Amino acid sequence: EIDYMAKPNSSPFETELLEAIKISQSRSVQRDDIQWIPSVSNGFTDSRFTRELGVITYGFRGTHPDDNPNLENVHGTNENYGVKSLVSSTKTMLGVIWELCNPVI
């Protein structure tokens, strides 16, 4: 018998939020050939609380395609993240806010 600490959950893939992320990521790295692949992580996240409330929740890294993914070590020993990835992920998050809130502003 499996003793779950939380109910398994997921968010739909084709959403307004994901479209805003795609647009913003493309702009932040100045490329329109980025391929998007949904995946499942074995990590633990607070999304178990937000999804229960009906909030679409994604894990998103925003890694820059020119940074070496083999050097990225998030949440591990000698944790590091490429500078280009830090800049592009920050631009992407700001872009997502703009895309989603633009009609309101």
Stretches found by the model and what they are:
Residues 1-94, 98-105:
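Metal-dependent amide/peptide-bond hydrolase catalytic core
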